[in-house]
Amino acid sequence: AREADSRWIGELWQNYLNTVAANRQIPAQQVFPGAQGLLEGLTKTGGDTAKYALENKLVDALASSAEIEKALTKEFGWSKTDKNYRAISYYDYALKTPADTGDSIGVVFANGAIMDGEETQGNVGGDTTAAQIRDARLDPKVKAIVLRVNSPGGSVTASEVIRAELAAARAAGKPVVVSMGGMAASGGYWISTPANYIVANPSTLTGSIGIFGVITTVENSLDSIGVHTDGVSTSPLADVSITRALPPEAQQMMQLSIENGYKRFITLVADARHSTPEQIDKIAQGHVWTGQDAKANGLVDSLGDFDDAVAKAAELAKVKQWHLEYYVDEPTFFDKVMDNMSGSVRAMLPDAFQAMLPAPLASVASTVKSESDKLAAFNDP
């Protein structure tokens, strides 16, 4: 596992170096010359990191906030109303879109851990996403579907609900293209298998073709404080509890279910990628691949971004003019309130709420939320 992690982390790091080097038009070695090289460079500048960045062309100039404001005001003018240089927040900026007439390409998002039931904030709801895909399938104006996946996986059951609906869309004659974001692993890849075509970013983390199950028990923790439980039941399976070790029969049943799910997973991938379960098993077993490696292993069709995926969907659907039709949940009352705020205000809200807490509590709250979000993903039946 350590070797596998080192491999993909190394590839992501190299992709980062190459991207920065290309944009700054300098050698990758200049972006990061290694720990010793960086130390030598900082020694020459007397520890001045800003000067080091300038001399190595990592930045174009050094300036204070006041100097930057003065330059931007000179370039764009001053707004007396906003008391700032004329600008618009990135969050408030709206792209000009064509009129929503004629043929369309449906866009469905799968962002977050995949869970059973309805969608919740930050997670993918199996039923919700499947319903969105169904709506796109039944709309005669929608000529193709793009599924944007940015998910680490989650529930097998929910993943299958989404996969089945996507397969139905393809069977109905609508081309399906998957656009992989930063991550499309495990269940994120499961839901991608029905696609006619898969586009990944070179740095996408995908694969992780495998299944595991977790049942938390605390009998050892209770034992350490002298707490024990007992009882009677008609079967070892009738009274499974977190206060006692999982019965051997239940452990074996769980293992059989996991093994069956894994066979199902590699068979789905094999059928989708025109391979065999045996060949897929060699690159599966939970291994994580970057987009580049996934392309080499035949798990994706090409490297690119969302726009490339949309262009491919239009090509497969043989449409020359189209607009994008986004399928999202109906907004709640809270969503509508948030929509009435400026984008920049919405962006600051999470930090504002956290700022209300004392520093130690804010740190703990952030950690607890992160860990609870992980546990929340384990909601398979």
Predicted regions and their residues:
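Intrinsically disordered, low-complexity segments enriched in small/flexible residues
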Residues: 1-50, 54-137, 141-144, 233-234, ...
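Catalytic-center loop of serine/cysteine hydrolases
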Residues: 1-23, 172, 185, 195-272, ...
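Terminal peptide-recognition signature
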Residues: 5, 53, 108, 147, ...
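Cleft-lining beta-strand/loop regions that shape enzyme active-site pockets
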Residues: 20, 97-221
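Hydrophobic, secondary-structure "cap" segments at the distal end of domains
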Residues: 24-32, 269-280
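Active-site-proximal glycine-rich helix-loop-beta segment
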Residues: 49-58, 188-197, 297-299
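Gly/Pro- and small hydrophobic-enriched strand-loop and loop-to-helix capping segments
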Residues: 59-69, 195-210, 300-310
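Long hydrophobic segments that form regular secondary structure
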Residues: 137-142, 263-277, 287, 291-295
